[in-house]
């Protein structure tokens, strides 16, 4: 009856001297959460061929998983009950179960693993680090009988994973076939050839270390070595070898070492000493090129580099599980494929782990950048460059450290995959950072230029736009390059920002061009306003001078009076001169704006057209029917009411009123046809407007022309000729104006005629006879009295002189003005008197209330322009 194995929770943590079946080890099926269960070791494969999924847990607890390639694996073979576990316990300080002295039965079922526990104080005898020992179920046991399936599978598993295979035999079994485990070794040789066929590029070399137990020394160890090697060579020669390996020898695939141990029961002290000495052999060594057998040097280490399977410790559990899965399912064992699968599995795990750390560093920046994009305000992320470089370097380095130990092809492929994933995300961040720097840089550049221009305008237009653009462009490029350089990740092709820099420069050029065009438009507007102000003043003066055909109040203060028939010549010359001044101002300012020749040509062309439109509107305003009729009447009255010296006429019945009236009227009527068309008196033709404006520049765009008023004789699509453009009054308006003027002139004539004959018709003739009859005595009294006579004489002389000098009119006006002033002064004194008394104040208050009730609203008369809107003064001093 088989002993029942206790539960893991109830096992003793310290193994007793005799244990049935490694009950103190963590076996297949035990829970992985209890670290104490792994104190002594772990069952790798149970007797039912089940692999333990918790092997990686044991390696982690023993601090082997992080050792990389710095670990070694030893397997022990031998017949059942030959002391394999005892040998391992003495060599490596393990606690594998050993057979009881009271009964002989199988104690090791399946494959068990434990880590080396032996520590040597002598540095020269120090064993290698992280030695893992696998105790394999013994062969030729009665429990399995003739079933050699597990024997073959365990041998194949041990050979695929182990560096050193310890063969435990007794001295008296040397030379025997079954007793010396030659059948097992034949199986080992066969599976080794099977592995070679699957991976011809790699020779899987292993060390067969024969430990000869109960060595008495009677037969020299060298002779025993020769016997064993001869037997092994015969077995190798008997194997059916694949094509190309017919002449291969056993030494092409295996190295051999031999060591003899005394009898443990009879010579326990010698056994312990030799076991300790043998244990010191399990260290790392180097092969001498002249050595053929490792046993040639007893003191050399057994762990040679070519024995190592080059499986990283953290992937060994997964690799071993894959190997056993293929073995137990009777599949051809393909170690290269298993190594690639392991590399694929581990590299994927490592890749995910490094990406987790990468996400912790990068995701916050990605979220901030995405939030800015959603808000429509891309944000420059501070510290992005160092974070990107640090995260990428750390991720790649960690992956390289952990994954470079695996299959090189898989490692390189997975590293490329990792770099691709990382670079895809970092590139998006890099592009987003450059995009944010681009947009914010363009905005800052535009604001900086605009602010500098405004500051210059406040200082009196003393700014150089081209210099401002140059300085701000340089500053913007430096800021962009600074941000780009700070975000560059060295060693990546995608972090080259030269193309983005060129695009940024292009956009800055477009923005500066747009700002220059905006400034040019503002300049053009200021110049046009300046032209309008100057023309409004000058043209108004010219039309006001139409009434200066006499020497009165309408005449110029100095110089000769202007010729009325040359009014258009004067207006045209003033217009041309004003526009020339404006062109010089425009050209000077445009040059400071770094405008191109084409832009200046278009600006001057627009300025001339706009200026003509301003002049045309001003002329139409002055030539409005009401304004023109008023000017004609003033011109007529100046010529009719004043003489050539500018002295007002006092009409007498003897004056030639009809002649003066006719001459003044006809002279004024000649102005109507003169003013009806813009014709220069110099050549009796319209001004050369088409040549003066010039052809449309080739660089002008549709936007440059859309706000321009068509001009007859210049724009063919307008359909009007130059003569029509210069026509101010058509025939119908001229006739109507003539009729209305004549009526107004007739009224003035009638008024003058009435004033001339008014003094005579008011005094009847009989009044003079009556005055003479009644005042005869007074007349004689004056004539007889010298004083009265002299006073009368002086008055008569004064009246005559006044009449001759035509001073009666001014004297009467002066008398009238004096009387009005005296009346106002009287009213003022009366008001002051009334305000000084209570009765007067009450009377004034009652009068004011009555006036407020009876009086209607008062309206102020305002001057209107030709469009019927209130005319406002133009600013005549625009700063351009």
Curated annotation (Swiss-Prot):
GB1/RHD3-type G domain ranges (all copies): 68-307
Topology in the lipid bilayer: Multi-pass membrane protein
Domain of life: Eukaryota
Residues spanning the membrane: 763-783, 787-807
Keyword Transmembrane helix recorded: yes
Membrane topology (Cytoplasmic): 1-762, 808-880
Pfam family, one: Sey1_3HB
Enzyme class: hydrolase
GO molecular function terms listed in the Swiss-Prot or TrEMBL record: GTP binding; GTPase activity
A GO-annotated cellular component: endoplasmic reticulum membrane
Coiled-coil zones: 463-517, 812-839
UniProt-listed PROSITE patterns: G_GB1_RHD3 (PS51715)
Region (Disordered): 846-880
Lumenal side: 784-786
Alphabetized InterPro entries for the sequence: G_GB1_RHD3_dom, P-loop_NTPase, RHD3/Sey1, Sey1/RHD3-like_3HB
Keywords recorded for this protein, A-Z: Coiled coil, Endoplasmic reticulum, GTP-binding, Hydrolase, Membrane, Nucleotide-binding, Transmembrane, Transmembrane helix
Binding residue positions for GTP: 78-85
GO annotation terms (biological process): endoplasmic reticulum membrane fusion
Function noted in UniProt: Cooperates with the reticulon proteins and tubule-shaping DP1 family proteins to generate and maintain the structure of the tubular endoplasmic reticulum network. Has GTPase activity, which is required for its function in ER organization.
Entry similarity comment: Belongs to the TRAFAC class dynamin-like GTPase superfamily. GB1/RHD3 GTPase family. RHD3 subfamily.
The protein's name in its UniProt record: Protein sey1
Taxonomic source organism: Talaromyces stipitatus (strain ATCC 10500 / CBS 375.48 / QM 6759 / NRRL 1006) (Penicillium stipitatum)
Source taxonomy: Eukaryota, Fungi, Dikarya, Ascomycota, Pezizomycotina
């Amino acid at each position: 009856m088989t002993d029942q194995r206790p539960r893991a929770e109830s096992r003793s943590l310290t193994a007793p001297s005799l244990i049935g079946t490694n009950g103190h080890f963590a076996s297949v099926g035990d829970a992985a959460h209890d670290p104490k269960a792994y104190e002594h070791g772990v069952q790798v494969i149970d007797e039912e061929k089940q692999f333990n999924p918790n092997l990686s847990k044991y390696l982690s607890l023993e601090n082997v998983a992080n050792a990389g390639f710095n670990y070694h694996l030893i397997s022990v073979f031998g017949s059942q009950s030959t002391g394999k576990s005892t040998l391992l316990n003495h060599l490596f300080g393990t606690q594998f179960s050993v057979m009881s002295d009271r009964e002989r039965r199988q104690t090791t079922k399946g494959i068990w693993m434990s880590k080396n526990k032996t520590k040597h104080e002598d540095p020269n005898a120090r064993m290698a680090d992280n030695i893992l020992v696998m105790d394999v179920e013994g062969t030729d046991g009665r429990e399995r009988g003739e079933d050699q399936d597990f024997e073959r599978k365990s041998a194949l598993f041990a050979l695929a994973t182990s560096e050193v295979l310890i063969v435990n035999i007794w001295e008296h079994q040397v030379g025997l076939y079954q007793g010396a485990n030659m059948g097992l070794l034949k199986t080992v040789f066969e599976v080794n050839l099977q592995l070679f066929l699957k991976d011809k590029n790699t020779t899987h070399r292993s060390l067969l270390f024969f430990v000869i137990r109960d060595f008495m020394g009677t037969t020299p160890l060298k002779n025993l070595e020769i016997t064993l090697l001869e037997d092994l060579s015969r077995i190798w020669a008997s194997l059916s070898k694949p094509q190309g390996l017919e002449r291969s020898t056993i030494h092409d695939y295996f190295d051999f070492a031999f060591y003899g141990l005394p009898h443990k029961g009879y010579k326990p002290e010698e056994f312990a000493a030799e076991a300790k000495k043998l244990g010191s052999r399990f260290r790392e060594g180097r092969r001498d090129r002249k050595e053929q057998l490792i046993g040639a040097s007893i003191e050399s280490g057994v762990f040679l580099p070519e024995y190592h399977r080059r499986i990283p410790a953290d992937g060994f559990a997964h690799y071993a599980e894959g190997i056993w899965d293929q073995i137990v399912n009777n599949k051809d064992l393909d170690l290269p494929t298993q190594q690639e699968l392991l590399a694929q599995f581990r590299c994927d795990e490592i890749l995910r782990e490094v990406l987790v750390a990468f996400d912790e560093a990068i995701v916050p920046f990605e979220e901030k950048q995405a939030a800015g994009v959603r808000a429509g305000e891309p944000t420059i992320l501070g510290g992005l460059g160092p974070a990107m470089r640090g995260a990428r370097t750390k991720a790649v380095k960690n992956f390289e450290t952990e994954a470079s130990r695996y299959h090189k092809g898989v490692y390189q492929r997975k590293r490329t995959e990792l770099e691709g994933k990382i670079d895809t995300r970092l590139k998006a961040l890099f592009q987003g950072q450059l995009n944010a720097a681009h947009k914010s840089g363009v905005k800052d550049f535009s604001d900086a230029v605009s602010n500098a221009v405004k500051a210059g305008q406040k200082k009196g237009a003393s700014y150089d736009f081209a210099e401002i653009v140059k300085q701000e462009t340089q500053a913007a490029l430096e800021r962009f390059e600074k941000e780009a350089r700070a975000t560059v990740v060295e060693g990546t092709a995608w972090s080259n920002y030269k193309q983005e820099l060129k695009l940024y420069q292009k956009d800055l050029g477009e923005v500066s061009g747009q700002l220059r065009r905006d400034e040019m438009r503002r300049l053009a507007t200021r110049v046009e306003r300046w032209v309008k102000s100057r023309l409004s003043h000058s043209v108004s003066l010219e039309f006001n001078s139409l009434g200066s055909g006499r020497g009165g109040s309408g005449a110029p203060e100095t110089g000769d009076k202007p010729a009325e028939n040359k009014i258009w010549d004067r207006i045209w010359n003033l217009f041309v001169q004003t526009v020339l001044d404006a062109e010089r101002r425009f050209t000077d300012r445009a040059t400071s704006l770094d405008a191109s020749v084409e832009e200046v040509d278009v600006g001057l062309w627009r300025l001339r057209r706009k200026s003509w439109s301003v002049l045309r509107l001003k002329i139409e305003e002055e030539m409005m029917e009401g304004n023109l009729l008023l000017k004609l009447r003033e011109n007529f009255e100046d010529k009719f009411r004043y003489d050539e010296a500018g002295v007002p006429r006092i009409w007498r019945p003897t004056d030639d009123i009809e002649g003066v009236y006719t001459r003044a009227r006809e002279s004024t009527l000649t102005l109507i046809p003169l003013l009806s068309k813009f014709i220069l008196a110099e050549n009796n033709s319209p001004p050369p407007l088409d040549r003066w404006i010039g052809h449309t520049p080739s660089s002008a765009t549709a936007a440059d022309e859309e706000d321009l008023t068509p001009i007859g004789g210049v724009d063919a699509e307008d359909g009007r000729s130059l003569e029509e453009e210069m026509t101010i009054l058509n025939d119908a308006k001229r006739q109507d104006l003539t009729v209305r003027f004549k009526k107004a002139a007739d009224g003035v004539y009638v008024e003058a005629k009435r004033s001339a004959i008014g003094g005579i018709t008011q005094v009847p003739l009989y009044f003079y006879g009556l005055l003479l009859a009644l005042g005869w005595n007074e007349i004689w009294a004056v004539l007889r009295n010298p004083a009265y006579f002299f006073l009368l004489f002086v008055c008569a002389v004064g009246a005559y002189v006044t009449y001759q000098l035509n001073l009666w009119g001014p004297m009467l006006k002066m008398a009238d003005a004096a009387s009005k002033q005296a009346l106002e002064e009287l009213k003022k004194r009366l008001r002051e008197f009334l305000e000084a008394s209570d009765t007067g104040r009450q009377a004034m208050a009652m009068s004011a209330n009555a006036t407020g009730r009876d009086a209607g609203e008062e309206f102020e008369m305002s001057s209107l322009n030709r469009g019927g809107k209130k005319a406002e003064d133009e600013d005549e001093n625009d700063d351009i």
